């Protein structure tokens, strides 16, 4: 921001997937370090961000643990441990260094993250997606319930993308009008579908 050719009055961050976790981490660390830019941050948009993790990483970690218990399958467990720190952060949605410090990131462990709310004084928006279309019929409500809990956008469940958690302390306080669910859309399609762009424009224009 200091190198920008003119003075920056306000900053908006548009993030996708793990980029949202990085943005939350950066906001917290910058505030603790006394940096100036968090005061310029006015809007923060999350698209498909796994605020509370992604089941696929947890399943992968469980499989890796099973493989490591048997001598004959242990070499395959070593392959599973090639996963990057960023990928293992997806297990629960780690944001702060303290969330993984002094822990073996490949070991199965309960969610021990520090509670971190959304940055204060910033308008935050959450876009979540589900691969299930609106649909009709007697099983429509069942399909939607399963999608909310399990499928989501194919990587991130709806509840995780919306910051919802069974522990109220961990639920992120997105205003209802700042949440939007895209139907019939997967994780990567959030980056290119016109419906998403229209919603972002509506939010950001309304916030100016």
Task: Specify the residue positions occupied by each region the protein language model found.
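Helical cap/lid subdomain of alpha/beta-hydrolase-fold lipid enzymes
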Residues: 28-208
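Conserved acidic catalytic loop of the alpha/beta-hydrolase fold
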Residues: 1-11
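Short, well-ordered amphipathic alpha-helices
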Residues: 1, 23-32
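Gly/Ala-rich beta-loop-alpha elbow adjacent to hydrolase catalytic centers
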Residues: 14-19, 23
